[in-house]
């Protein structure tokens, strides 16, 4: 059988059951996003959205380790186009960004902790809810950034019927290695976040205007003043690329210090799906979607969603 796979370098560029209808907040008068509250196994999960009147597809974005959905995917910078949600909505997609437990507008649960399996279950439930909002459309495309990419991969393996494609952005690992549990205190630390942490993902000034960094620092600190407490990283071992049958796009910036090209190649080769692509964004680092590589990042995902079939 022919392998439908591609390695691409992009040219640089400036258990969802019946439930009550979710709470929703309409778009703000100043053009802010819609906000929904989706119940996931009895816990309220905040979901942000920008949606055209007649979408042709749906996409769910999952944030990483430190910051929540809105600063990561709906960043507002005067004079710059950096909102992922707005860019996808402008191209006809209903774009959603989730706040996982303990992030942004989603409260912690009684445990105070968030584990990979709990996060993956919430993401799966949100995907199910999104599908009910767009019953005539294909199942959503799932995009995870950094730590969120691993959880997106877990969801794609455990619940492939909930999504059409999965995009793993800003993450790669050697599949022959295993994740381990880090030591955690008896109770969550509830540590304050810092402006230094907010700026840390922006590495190259060549693709990151200072206005973008300043806006992200302000909006990230407002959304997530307290660091979420995580544990159970050994659960990430549920992400086994050899079990991933969903069409997948693996994408990272060429200057992302957290991604080794060799590891990305090993992970790409291990993916079971024949329908897979690997995209490298030249000059981009870990926050490629917020930098001057924003348009190239958006285009790579939309091109993957719209790829023609290998056979006619």
Residue ranges with predicted function:
Residues 22-53:
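N-terminal cap/lid segment of alpha/beta-hydrolase-fold proteins
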Residues 54, 59-93:
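Short, surface-exposed "cap/lid" segments of acyl-processing enzymes
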Residues 70-71, 99-114:
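Glycine-rich "HGGG/HGxG" loop immediately N-terminal to the catalytic nucleophile
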Residues 120-138:
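Conserved acidic catalytic loop of the alpha/beta-hydrolase fold
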Residues 138, 143, 147-174:
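Conserved hydrolase catalytic core segment
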Residues 244, 250-252:
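Short beta-strand/loop motif that positions the catalytic acidic residue
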Residues 257-263:
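Conserved alpha/beta-hydrolase "acid-adjacent" motif
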Residues 284-294:
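Catalytic histidine-centered segment of alpha/beta-hydrolase-like enzymes
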């Amino acid at each position: 059988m022919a392998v439908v796979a591609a390695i691409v370098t992009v040219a640089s560029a400036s258990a969802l059951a019946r439930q009550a209808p979710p709470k929703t907040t309409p778009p703000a008068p100043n053009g802010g996003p819609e906000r929904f509250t989706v119940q996931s196994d009895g816990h309220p999960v905040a979901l942000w959205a920008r949606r055209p009147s007649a979408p042709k597809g749906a996409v769910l974005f999952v944030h990483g380790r430190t910051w929540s959905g809105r600063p990561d995917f709906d960043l507002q910078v005067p004079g710059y186009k950096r909102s992922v949600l707005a860019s996808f909505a402008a191209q006809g997609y209903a774009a959603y960004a989730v706040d996982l437990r303990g992030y942004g507008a989603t409260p912690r649960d009684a445990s105070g902790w968030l584990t990979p399996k709990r996060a993956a279950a919430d993401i799966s439930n949100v995907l199910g809810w999104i599908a009910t909002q767009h019953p005539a459309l294909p199942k959503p495309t799932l995009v995870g950034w950094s730590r969120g990419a691993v959880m997106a991969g877990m969801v794609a393996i455990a619940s492939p019927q909930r999504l059409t494609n999965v995009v793993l952005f800003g993450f790669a690992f050697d599949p022959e290695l295993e994740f381990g549990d880090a030591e955690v205190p008896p109770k969550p630390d509830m540590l304050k976040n810092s402006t230094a942490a907010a700026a840390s993902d922006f590495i190259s000034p060549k693709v990151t205007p200072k206005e973008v960094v300043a806006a992200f620092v302000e909006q990230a600190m407002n959304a997530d003043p307290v660091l979420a407490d995580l544990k159970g990283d050994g659960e990430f071992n549920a992400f086994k690329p050899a079990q991933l049958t969903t069409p997948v796009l693996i994408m990272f910036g060429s200057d992302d210090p957290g991604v080794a090209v060799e590891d990305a190649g090993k992970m790409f080769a291990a993916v079971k799906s024949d329908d897979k692509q690997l995209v490298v964004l030249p000059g981009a680092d870990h926050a490629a979607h917020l930098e001057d590589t924003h348009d190239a990042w958006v285009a790579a995902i939309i091109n993957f969603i719209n790829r023609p079939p290998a056979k006619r």
